[in-house]
């Protein structure tokens, strides 16, 4: 029954400043969106005192670019935790789909939890 908080969805709109010289969303923007949805998911499910006490940092990104979109396109990102945490580390997956449901970008990241005080 606890799987509900394991998944989180957010929509992004490709803005003019997100677009590269090829007319598509820049690769670095997808990484930024990964960090934005990860932060939103953490804030949505974590206790406030944990949000205040800890910060997550990325130690690894594995990214498959399968498609892309242009300016004004709406992209739906779904993030989920595929396994159990390993101590203060865990993997997070983020899948980005276009309006038609086509998988555009698939990301698997490793995150480490740090104490904000340190």
Where in this protein do the model-derived segments appear?
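Hot-dog-fold acyl-thioester-processing enzymes
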Residues: 2-60, 114-118
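HotDog/MaoC-like acyl-thioester-processing domains
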Residues: 4-10, 65-74, 81-118
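Short charge-dense sequence patches
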Residues: 23-30, 77-85
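Short Pro/Gly-enriched beta-strand edge/turn motifs at strand-loop
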Residues: 59, 76-77
């Amino acid at each position: 029954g606890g799987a509900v908080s394991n998944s989180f969805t957010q929509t992004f709109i490709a803005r003019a400043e997100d677009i590269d010289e090829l007319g598509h969303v820049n690769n670095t923007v997808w990484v930024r969106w990964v960090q934005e949805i990860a932060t939103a998911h953490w804030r949505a499910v974590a206790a406030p005192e944990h949000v205040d006490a800890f910060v997550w940092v990325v130690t690894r990104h594995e990214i498959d670019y399968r498609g892309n979109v242009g300016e004004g396109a709406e992209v739906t990102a779904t993030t989920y935790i595929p396994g159990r945490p390993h101590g203060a580390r865990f993997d997070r997956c983020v899948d980005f789909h276009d309006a038609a449901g086509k998988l555009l970008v698939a990301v698997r990241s490793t995150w480490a939890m740090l104490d904000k005080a340190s």
